[in-house]
């Protein structure tokens, strides 16, 4: 049985911008040292906004302290250089007591040097920012100084255990027996020194990471409460990075739920969940693990607004340009093994299509057993348009399901099908409204998971057994044709010219 450990985020160590100008954060995983830190793109931290806000807030506070310190030093030097002239300007007697009072009065009218109260009460002001953190103050000869955040006994900053609140974010299949996730999470106690929070980001079907709470009066908090069940991955308050057979997946997320395995396409190395041989290998490995564990079925979905954009064209150009014969064989075999894994998987496969599915991402859908789609989803297989032959057994399954006329229009002309059209033609089982899509899917998946594993597996065998050998033969022929196409200079030049034109258009 494959293990299903969840890796919890301890804190954010650093951030940077990648080559595309997007933010990446250096994550410290709880229970791991600094050598295990990994850079994660911002779209993988969909529900870890409070970690991001805390990190950004501390940096903003640090910058403010530096600026305040510089201004304090400058103002002090100016006062020292003026000397008695300060007292003369005040038009007050020059006795020591009055002089001291005058100095403090000038200090109050200087905005950067607002006088703090000793023993600050910690209550937020009525006109302050809505989300705040606990910070202590003291007055030093050089001016205002901010004391470090207090550490609680569990090592977290102002940490309070928020088990009741966290439990609301778990689905029924998320809390495994013997695995108390709440032992590793602490709610942040927000609310004394005003520190602005950055706007929280939202991104389709994705993984959920967070550790902390927001002020109840914050509009961000109200938005999270309203949308906490909108997306599969916004139910958990943890990282969904999972250990399967002692290895971590880089471009997919695998979550072991109660009665089923959930695989999410979440590519770090390609845009719009495009497929490369490495990503397809990870999916195959996850399918192999799910086939041998106690899961009754498999749920396949994706992170982001696009389900899958098919093969990664930029990857094809780079690899086929370097070594045409070797790479054409390797990529064609990767596609063959990827499709074969779906054909041979014995348990029911449920697919949740949250957005566009193109090319190979749409071709594999007939190999799955149930396809549920959002109203926003659409389907396209423009193989002839991009100078490729069909893949994913679509040359056989599409005419069988859609009819020869519509299948030819999709494969030869790249016709786009809406979710409703795909449902009426039999490619999609059912279409749901986007705002309730995740709830509808999870409800039905959990109902299926309550059935007998033997009944589900044997039922699929009865439906699919006579097609298995046919699909395997079709898969072999399609991949052989792709290999021949990529190996020939004519076919490769045609592909390059089209893909380069598309890249230049972007």
Curated annotation (Swiss-Prot):
Domain Chromo: from-to ranges: 7-67
CDD domains per UniProt: CD_CDY, crotonase-like
Compositional bias per record (Polar residues), positions renumbered to this chain: 133-143
Keywords in alphabetical order: Nucleus
Main location: nucleus
Keyword Nucleus appears in the UniProt entry: yes
InterPro entries the UniProt entry points to: Chromo-like_dom_sf, Chromo/chromo_shadow_dom, Chromo_domain, Chromodomain_CS, ClpP/crotonase-like_dom_sf, ECH/Chromodomain_protein, Enoyl-CoA_hydra/iso, Enoyl-CoA_hydra_C
Residue ranges with Basic residues bias: 101-120
Biased composition (Basic and acidic residues): 88-98
Location within or outside the cell: Nucleus
Cellular component, GO annotation: nucleus
Single GO MF descriptor: histone H3K9me2/3 reader activity
Disordered as annotated region, ranges: 64-177
Tissues with expression: Ubiquitously expressed.
Quaternary organization: Interacts (via chromo domain) with histone H3K9me3.
Protein name (record): Chromodomain Y-like protein 2
Organism name: Homo sapiens
Origin organism lineage: Eukaryota, Metazoa, Chordata, Craniata, Vertebrata
């Amino acid at each position: 049985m494959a293990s299903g450990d969840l890796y919890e985020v301890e804190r954010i160590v650093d951030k940077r911008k990648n080559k595309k100008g997007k933010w990446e954060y250096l994550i410290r995983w709880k229970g791991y040292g600094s050598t295990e830190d990994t850079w994660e793109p911002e779209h993988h931290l969909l529900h870890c906004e409070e970690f991001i806000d805390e990190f950004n807030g501390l940096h903003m506070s640090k910058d403010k302290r530096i600026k305040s310190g510089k201004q304090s030093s400058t103002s002090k030097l100016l006062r020292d250089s003026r000397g008695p002239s300060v007292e003369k300007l005040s038009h007050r007697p020059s006795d020591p007591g009055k002089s001291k009072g005058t100095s403090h009065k000038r200090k109050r009218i200087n905005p950067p040097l607002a006088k703090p109260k000793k023993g600050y009460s910690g209550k937020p002001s009525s006109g302050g920012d809505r989300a705040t953190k606990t910070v202590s103050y003291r007055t030093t000869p050089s001016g205002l100084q901010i004391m470090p955040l207090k550490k609680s006994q569990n090592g977290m900053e102002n940490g309070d255990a928020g088990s009741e609140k966290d439990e609301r974010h778990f689905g029924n299949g998320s809390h495994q027996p013997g695995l108390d996730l709440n032992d590793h999470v602490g709610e942040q106690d927000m609310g004394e020194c005003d520190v602005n929070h950055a706007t929280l980001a939202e991104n389709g079907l994705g993984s959920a990471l967070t550790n902390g709470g927001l002020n109840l009066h914050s509009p961000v908090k109200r938005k999270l409460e309203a949308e906490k069940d909108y997306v599969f991955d916004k139910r958990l308050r943890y990282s969904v990075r999972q250990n399967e057979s002692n290895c971590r997946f880089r471009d997919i997320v695998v979550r072991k739920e109660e009665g089923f395995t959930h695989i999410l396409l979440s590519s770090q190395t390609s845009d719009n969940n495009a497929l490369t041989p490495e990503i397809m290998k990870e999916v195959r490995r996850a399918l192999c693990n799910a086939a041998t564990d106690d899961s009754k079925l498999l749920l396949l979905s994706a992170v982001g607004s696009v389900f899958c954009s098919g093969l990664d064209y930029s990857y094809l150009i780079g690899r086929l340009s370097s070594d045409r014969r070797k790479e054409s064989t390797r990529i064609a075999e990767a596609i063959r093994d990827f499709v074969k894994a779906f054909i041979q998987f014995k348990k029911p496969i449920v697919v949740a299509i949250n957005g566009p599915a193109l090319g190979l991402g749409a071709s594999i859908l007939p190999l799955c057993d149930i396809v549920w789609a959002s109203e926003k989803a659409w389907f396209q297989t423009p193989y002839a348009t991009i100078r490729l032959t069909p893949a994913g057994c679509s040359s056989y399954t599409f005419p069988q399901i859609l009819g020869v006329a519509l299948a030819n229009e999709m494969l030869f002309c790249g016709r786009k099908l809406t979710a409703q059209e795909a449902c009426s033609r039999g490619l999609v089982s059912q279409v749901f409204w986007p705002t309730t899509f995740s709830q509808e899917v999870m409800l039905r998946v959990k109902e299926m998971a309550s059935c007998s594993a033997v009944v589900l597996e044997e039922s699929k065998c009865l439906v699919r057994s006579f097609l298995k050998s046919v699909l395997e033969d079709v898969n072999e022929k399609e991949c052989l044709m792709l290999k021949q196409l990529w190996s020939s200079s004519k076919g490769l030049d045609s592909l390059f010219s089209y893909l380069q034109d598309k890249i230049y258009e972007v």
